[in-house]
Amino acid sequence: LSHWSCAPRTAAQPSFLDDYYGCVYVLEENPWHLRTLSLSLREGQPHISLETDQESCTLQVGLHGDWIANDAFLSMPRENERLNMMFHTGPVRHWVSGGWASDFCFIFQVRSTDWMDYNTFYCRFNGQRLSLVVESNMERMSHCRRRIPMRPWPYPDHQIEGKRQSAN
């Protein structure tokens, strides 16, 4: 069953520990309204902090294909609100898994219990710079033989640039 995991294929840490941890990256204006992103390491477990104009959250990230439940996540746009309402399951939990795809690219995926949509975040670090891509996907229902008609998704996957905030 471990081969069936939908978690991103990643390593627990890069081959060398750089100074990505504990730094805040300020992001350029974007459709998601994300303002800052930071990556921290607490007791060997990565945590991602995200902030928008209205809210903020810190997510504990599961490693090695494990998913960790988080109680809070940002109010991300969802592709198909009607299906999300039909399959709502009660108290919302946000399951997060990820890790290092390379020495400079941290990937994490957020799947919520009441959404059919899920988001994958690709964080590419380059010195003082960060390139972030947020990819939104709709969970395919295996029992459906026909494609579910969708509206065009107004949030295209595109690169969001960020710059490391200088220490005061």
Question: Where are the regions that the model predicts?
Answer:
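Peripheral terminal and inter-domain segments
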Residues: 1-168
